[in-house]
């Protein structure tokens, strides 16, 4: 069958939500049709995977539609399989239990119905419930509640006889003490339901459970109510509840049994979650615009205000008296063991003290800080009265102390937010009112992140309330209090506009306009990031709110003061404490809702003047800036922060009833918009969205009532000399939003004059433009042009712009460097705005930002911050690429490392984008050199993913590089050799293929140079690369003959190199795509005649370069009695003109190659002279088979001489034997004797030194030996160390890439409890010290000496002493600052052996550098110096080569 089980399994496992929704119904149809799904039960494994996929991926999906579909499919499976589905119950139950706590009622209901169906058709209720007990302890309170409700439904459908209730009741009793009230209520309802089915025996059983008497009284009261109501199911009283003989412990009567277990199918299906849900689920969510009280059981601000003063009167006699009172209060509130009434009295006493003037005492505020913990505990209390009093007290503190309550408000706010979704109305409303009071009275910017973070809560109730709080905050607070969190506010409002809940969206749109009144520029930017549908919703919100029809008649007088706007949601309070709805100033002379279109064929200024005089003062477009709206339209927008003295008449309009959501239902006539292009971006920018024509323009005759100033203004005779008081309103200039300069038109001389005046009068500009919220010069200018780009973005009342210019970048950088992730995110948003404004950073700012970005690469909040960081990084690189050359190494390497991390797909794409931008922004040769350095850096241990990323990056770089960018340096040679080893990476085929592609790309990039580079490598590396290139050339030549047009995608310039290629024509032929088969080695046909001719060029080019290696790094550079010239070897070689020009970079005097810094393994001798392509000296012995046999003598001399083939015979190939030995050694902790034998055999092979063995098996052998060091058998551990030591003696050069790992494992072996192992470890460490390059060895040892404990630090110091004996004076000088701290630390160690070893190491250092050690020992005490001098003298007397003896210090 084409669409069998395997096909549907694949469909289930795919992740795309859209496809899932499409394929779900088809799958259900497939399962219901027995003819189509005949193979459903044939393959149990596939069925298991199918059910598992449905349970984990579908039912647990974040998309509720997918979850519902997943449950439908499972239901179809239950129907089809019946009792055969029983084996799958354990798979699906965890997911179904999780979904019992889902936020959507439909999901919970369907989940419960599915569980009931499983109990009926696939198993029995008891079997399912025994596997659901964990649900009573689920971390999600909704799930715990849902399990209780499911139990009630089970009892109603199947009756009590189907369950062993005595096993379930203890779990329910535990939930009676649950911290969540909804769970406690559900648990009580469960017990009541059980009582209905079982009877009085439940009452007796609960009495034995040790429950608190108060709780028992509540439960028993409910039992009595049920009994009196006549809804008991059992007719006979007192069944045997504890009897285990029956299923549920009772023997139901036939009547009750038939009533429950024989219930018809329809009746059973009728019992759904809806009937068992708590009644207040939906009402828990507040209604926007409603009062806090929300009916019976709640509280509002009036209750709070009465509670402020409804406290006993106290007197404060002294500071000490106050302090003692507060200490007693703190003691009571901090211990929830105290009686709740005592705690309530303590909370009231705080208010009493406030009324008595406690805030006037100096000791009050320190004591108040100490009460933070007590307040949190009280706000979390399970007793609602305590919570209520705590919230009233917090509100009172905020009202009395104002901003001085900043610390307490910040500390307590998160706890109070937890009350908002509480089902107990008294608790929820208390929390809401407390938060409102704090927002009104305590304007602390640190509260904003707390509010905005809760706007993303999973609870709809919390989100709705949070947007209400945000709206209140935007109305109540001054702009300067909000400036720090502009970006966070904008982001939060954007999320609210997209919220899943319609009421939250309504309030969020209201928040937007409040935000717009503070930060118009940012609001406009936010508007343009929204989709058109959301933009229209904002516009319609503005239109609907442009009316006063919903205002109460009492608030429509023209003299209504601005205070009426300052209390949204709670409304104004009359002296008697009565509340009325929120009012609005009504000064508009326009007809409500008369928004009109602008006409582009009318002069802008003329239209503006006419509009200011017309009866209709509406804005010029369907969407215009708030400044242009008639004042009366502010009824539902953010408050206007100045008091206006209104003039003119108001339009009397009959009020309309409000709907259930508290919103006005005034009729707004839908007017057609002919040719409505006003929603297009250009139109919005040009005239609608804060455009030139929005609002009254330069009309000096404008009445004072039409002016808006955002700051409190002195009236009367005030001369307003303060610069901050100079507002735009004096000149009758509106404040249009910023628009692009390209879209501004100076349409008259008036505008031109204004522009000139603006340019002349604003402060001298700095060399940069500040970002975002600081781009507002006009806030402090005496005049502003109507077309000025900044004329509407002023923030009067904030810090003047000319004082902020130097702060903006510093503040952004400080945010970016913050330890708080939200501040870092805010800083990044600010930095994005700054970069988009083309603000150029100074060198100091760049340096600091680079340091911050370097730290951000390791940001733990990857989901929250890292994604935004990557976006900012791209902009940063594009703008400042010319100044980031020094930072390129960190940038490139960190991005490549991130490619190896486990990141989300979207984040990974951003990392890749950053890499692409980096590649295109910097010189290719510089990037290539950095990558070469990164590959050979011993401190880096890239994982397989990082290796793939590096290789792919090099490949893409090689496609764009110029041939002259490829430099045959020592670093490049070592990196290429490393890449060649990666072509045989055993763990990853991706790495192997990528490495092969890179080698081919480099070969094609600069064939002569790459060929010469290969000639400098050991023969084994050459063999690996040559095989690959042979295979590639063979495949490419074949593919080019078959399809001449097939290309590899390289740019044509790559083949137009001016250098002559020593290879034959196949190198220049076009190549096909690199398929995996082309990249594999084809050893069978390697020497066949048919490809020999095409490979001759490659072979000759490699063989005709003489081979030499640099001075081997395993022997000391400092050799006594040896001259530098003796270290040279064959100076035979040939190079191209490019390498000839570079010759000087790799030469030192005497024609000897310079040692590259710590990493160079292979250097070619520079050519003596260039004599043309064939003018090279040819040495046929240089490439004999034994060229790379690592002979001890050759290693000591540190050269690969031409006659090395004469030093030993060709070794025997033990590859097959070693493979068997390794297989045996992989049996860790098993077959001890066999593995001992294998290790002994391996020891013999090690001494025979077979080249082929080590080429093929070295890495595997090393890793197995290091793993064997953890074996259970001590003899095996000791033997492994001896084998390791023998390999170190014979193959030291191979440990270069594994030095750190080998040293660490060897030192760890010193901790072994068996002396035999420790002795072997000491021998291995001693050999290791003489085998690995000294500098590399010391760099590994220094941190170990400083951080490790005894005996590892002792072994490391001893090893370091041996290394120092073979290091040169110059090299030791460079790394001495790293060495000395660890030794001085060891000199103070509690272990005498460590102290002694440290002294010996210092003596060894002194023997190398002499008196120059003295400055490093300044912190040693006199006694320690004397001891050190004693050992130095003793060493000098025993050393005949020493010429003099001197003290290190003057202390002696």
Curated annotation (Swiss-Prot):
Start-end of each HEAT repeat: 68-87, 88-124, 163-200, 407-442, 443-479, 926-963, 1256-1293, 1374-1411
Any Gene Ontology CC annotation: spindle
Subcellular location: Cytoplasm, Cytoskeleton; Cytoplasm, Cytoskeleton, Microtubule organizing center, Centrosome; Chromosome, Centromere, Kinetochore; Cytoplasm, Cytoskeleton, Spindle
Bias type Polar residues, positions: 573-597, 715-724, 1058-1070
Record bears the keyword Flavoprotein: no
UniProt cross-references to InterPro entries, sorted A to Z: ARM-like, ARM-type_fold, CLASP_N_dom, HEAT_type_2, TOG
Biased composition (Low complexity): 253-267, 550-569, 606-621, 645-659, 668-682, 781-792, 1034-1046
Domain of life assignment: Eukaryota
Any Gene Ontology biological process: regulation of microtubule polymerization or depolymerization
SUBUNIT field: Interacts (via C-terminus) with clip1/clip-170, and cenpe.
Function of the molecule: Microtubule plus-end tracking protein that promotes the stabilization of dynamic microtubules during anaphase. Plays a crucial role in chromatin-induced microtubule formation. May also act at microtubule minus ends. May be involved in the nucleation of noncentrosomal microtubules originating from the trans-Golgi network (TGN).
Family: Belongs to the CLASP family.
Protein name in UniProt: CLIP-associating protein 1
Native organism: Xenopus tropicalis (Western clawed frog)
Recorded name of the encoding gene: clasp1
């Amino acid at each position: 069958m084409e669409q069998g089980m395997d096909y549907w399994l694949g469909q289930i496992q795919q992740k795309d939500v859209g496809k899932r929704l499409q394929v779900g119904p088809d799958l259900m149809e497939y399962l219901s049709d027995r003819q189509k799904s005949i193979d459903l039960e044939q393959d149990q494994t596939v069925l298991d995977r199918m059910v598992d996929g449905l349970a984990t991926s579908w039912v647990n999906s974040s998309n509720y539609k997918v979850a519902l579909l997943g449950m439908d499919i499972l239901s179809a499976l239950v129907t089809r399989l019946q009792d055969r589905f029983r084996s799958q119950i354990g798979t699906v139950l965890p997911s179904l239990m999780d979904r019992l706590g889902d936020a959507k009622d439909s999901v919970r209901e369907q989940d419960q119905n599915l569980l009931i169906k499983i109990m009926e058709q696939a198993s029995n209720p008891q079997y399912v419930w025994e596997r659901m007990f964990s649900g009573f302890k689920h971390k999600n309170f909704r799930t715990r509640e849902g399990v209780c409700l499911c139990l009630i439904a089970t009892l109603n459908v199947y009756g009590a006889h189907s369950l062993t209730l005595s096993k379930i009741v203890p779990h329910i009793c535990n939930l009676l003490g649950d911290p969540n009230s909804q769970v406690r209520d559900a648990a009580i309802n469960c017990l009541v339901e059980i009582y209905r089915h079982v009877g009085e025996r439940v009452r007796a059983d609960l009495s034995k459970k040790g429950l608190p008497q108060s709780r028992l009284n509540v439960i028993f009261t409910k039992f009595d109510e049920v009994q009196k109501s006549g809804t008991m199911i059992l007719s006979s009283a007192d069944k045997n509840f504890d009897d285990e003989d029956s299923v549920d412990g009772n023997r139901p009567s036939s009547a009750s049994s038939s009533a429950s277990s024989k219930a018809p199918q329809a009746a059973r299906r009728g019992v759904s979650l809806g009937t068992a849900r708590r009644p207040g689920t939906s009402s828990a969510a507040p209604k926007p615009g409603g009062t806090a009280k929300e009916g019976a059981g709640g509280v509002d601000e009036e209750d709070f205000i009465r509670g402020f003063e409804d406290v006993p009167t106290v007197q404060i006699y002294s500071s000490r008296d106050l302090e003692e009172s507060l200490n007693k209060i703190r003691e009571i509130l901090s211990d929830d063991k105290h009686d709740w009434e005592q705690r309530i009295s303590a909370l009231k006493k705080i208010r009493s003290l406030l009324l008595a003037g406690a805030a006037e005492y100096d000791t009050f505020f320190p004591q108040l800080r100490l009460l933070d913990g007590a307040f949190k505990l009280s706000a979390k209390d399970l007793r609602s009265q305590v919570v209520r009093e705590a919230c009233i007290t917090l509100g009172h503190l905020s009202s009395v102390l104002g901003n001085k309550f900043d610390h307490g408000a910040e500390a307590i706010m998160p706890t109070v937010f937890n009350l908002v979704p509480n089902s107990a109305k008294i608790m929820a409303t208390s929390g809401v009112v407390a938060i409102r009071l704090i927002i009104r009275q305590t304007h602390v910017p640190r509260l904003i992140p707390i509010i905005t973070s809760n706007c993303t809560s999973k609870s709809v109730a919390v989100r709705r309330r949070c947007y209400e709080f945000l709206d209140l905050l935007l109305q109540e607070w001054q702009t300067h209090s909000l400036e720090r969190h502009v970006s966070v506010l904008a982001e939060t409002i954007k999320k609210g506009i997209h919220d899943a809940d319609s009421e939250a969206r309504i309030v969020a749109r209201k928040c937007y306009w409040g935000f717009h009144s503070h930060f118009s520029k940012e609001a406009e930017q936010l508007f343009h990031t929204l989709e058109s549908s959301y933009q229209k919703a904002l516009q319609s919100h503005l239109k609907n709110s442009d009316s006063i029809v919903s205002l109460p008649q009492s608030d429509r007088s023209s003299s209504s003061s601005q205070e009426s706007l300052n209390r949204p949601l709670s409304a104004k309070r009359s002296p008697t404490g009565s509340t009325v709805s929120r009012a609005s100033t009504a000064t508009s002379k326009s007809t409500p809702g008369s928004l009109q279109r602008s006409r582009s064929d009318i002069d802008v200024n003329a239209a503006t003047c006419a509009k200011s005089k017309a009866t209709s003062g509406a804005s010029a477009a369907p969407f215009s800036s708030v400044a242009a709206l008639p004042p009366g339209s502010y009824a539902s927008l953010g408050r206007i922060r100045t008091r206006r003295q209104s003039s003119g008449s108001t339009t009397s309009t009959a009020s309309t009833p409000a709907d259930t959501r508290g919103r006005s239902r005034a009729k707004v006539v839908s007017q057609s918009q002919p040719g409505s292009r006003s929603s297009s971006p250009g139109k919005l920018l040009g005239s609608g969205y804060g455009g030139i024509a929005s609002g009254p323009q330069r009309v000096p005759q404008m009445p004072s009532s039409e002016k808006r100033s955002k700051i409190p203004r002195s009236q009367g005779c005030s001369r307003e000399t303060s610069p901050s008081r100079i507002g735009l309103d004096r000149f009758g200039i509106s404040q249009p939003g910023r628009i692009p300069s390209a879209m501004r038109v100076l349409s008259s001389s008036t505008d031109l004059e204004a522009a000139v005046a603006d340019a002349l009068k604003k402060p001298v500009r700095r060399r940069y433009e500040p970002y975002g919220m600081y781009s507002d010069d006009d806030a402090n200018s005496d005049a502003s042009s109507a077309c000025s780009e900044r004329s509407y973005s002023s923030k009067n009342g904030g810090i003047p712009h000319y004082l902020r210019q130097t702060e903006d970048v510093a503040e952004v950088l400080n945010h970016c460097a913050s330890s708080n992730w939200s501040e870092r995110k805010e800083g990044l948003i600010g930095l994005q705005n700054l970069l988009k404004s083309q603000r150029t950073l100074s060198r100091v700012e760049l340096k600091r930002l680079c340091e911050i970005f370097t730290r951000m690469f390791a940001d733990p909040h990857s989901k929250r911050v890292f994604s935004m960081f990557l976006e900012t990084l791209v902009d940063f690189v594009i703008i400042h690429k010319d100044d980031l050359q020094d930072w390129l190494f960190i940038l490139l390497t960190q991005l490549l490392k991130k490619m190896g991390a486990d990141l989300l797909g979207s984040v990974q794409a951003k990392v890749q984008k950053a890499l692409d931008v980096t590649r295109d922004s910097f010189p290719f040769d510089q990037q290539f050199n950095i990558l070469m350095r990164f590959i050979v850096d011993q401190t880096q241990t890239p994982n397989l993913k990082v290796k793939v990323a590096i290789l792919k990056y090099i490949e893409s770089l090689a496609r764009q590089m110029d041939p002259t960018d490829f430099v045959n340096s020592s670093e490049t040679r070592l990196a290429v050799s490393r890449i060649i080893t990666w072509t045989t990476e055993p763990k990853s085929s991706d790495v192997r293929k990528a490495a092969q592609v890179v080698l081919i790309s480099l070969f094609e990039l600069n064939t002569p140079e790459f060929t010469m580079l290969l000639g400098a490598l050991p023969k084994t590396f050459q063999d690996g690369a040559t095989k690959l290139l042979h295979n590639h050339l063979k495949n490419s030549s074949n593919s080019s003959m078959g399809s001449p047009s097939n290309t590899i995608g390289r740019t044509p310039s790559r083949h137009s190199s001016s250098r002559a290629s020593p290879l034959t024509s196949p190198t220049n032929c076009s190549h096909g795509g690199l398929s995996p088969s082309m990249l594999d080695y084809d050893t069978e046909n390697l020497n066949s005649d048919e490809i020999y001719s095409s490979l001759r060029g490659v072979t000759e080019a490699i063989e005709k370069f003489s081979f030499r290696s640099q001075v081997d790094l395993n022997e000391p550079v400092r050799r006594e009695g040896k001259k530098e010239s003796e270290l040279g070897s064959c100076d035979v070689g040939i190079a191209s003109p490019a390498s000839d020009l570079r010759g000087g970079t790799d030469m030192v005097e005497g024609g000897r190659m310079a040692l590259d810094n710590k990493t160079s393994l292979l250097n070619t001798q520079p050519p003596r002279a260039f004599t043309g392509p064939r003018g090279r000296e040819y040495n046929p012995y240089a490439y004999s088979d034994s060229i790379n046999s690592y002979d001890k003598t050759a290693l000591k001399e540190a050269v690969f001489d031409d006659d090395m083939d004469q030093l030993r015979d060709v070794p025997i190939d033990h590859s097959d034997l070693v493979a068997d030995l390794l297989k045996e050694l992989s049996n860790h902790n098993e077959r001890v004797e066999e593995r001992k034998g294998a290790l002994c055999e391996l020891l013999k092979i090690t001494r025979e030194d077979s080249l082929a063995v080590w080429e093929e098996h070295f890495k595997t052998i090393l890793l197995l030996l290091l793993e064997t060091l953890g074996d259970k058998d001590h003899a095996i551990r000791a033997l492994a160390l001896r084998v390791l030591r023998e390999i170190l003696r014979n193959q030291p050069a191979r440990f270069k890439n594994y030095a750190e790992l080998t040293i660490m494992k060897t030192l760890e072996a010193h901790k072994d409890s068996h002396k035999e192992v420790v002795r072997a470890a000491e021998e291995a460490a001693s050999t290791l010290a003489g085998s690995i390059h000294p500098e590399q060895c010391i760099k590994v040892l220094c941190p170990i000496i400083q951080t490790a404990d005894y005996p590892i630090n002792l072994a490391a110091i001893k090893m370091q002493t041996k290394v120092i004996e073979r290091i040169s004076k110059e090299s030791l000088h460079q790394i001495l600052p790293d060495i000395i701290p660890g030794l001085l630390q060891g000199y103070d160690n509690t272990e005498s052996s460590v102290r002694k070893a440290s002294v010996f190491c210092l003596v060894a250092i002194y023997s190398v550098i002499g008196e120059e050690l003295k400055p490093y020992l300044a912190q040693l005490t006199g006694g320690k110096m004397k001891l050190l001098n004693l050992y130095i003298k003793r060493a000098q007397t025993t050393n005949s080569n020493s010429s003099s003896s001197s003290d290190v210090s003057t202390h002696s």
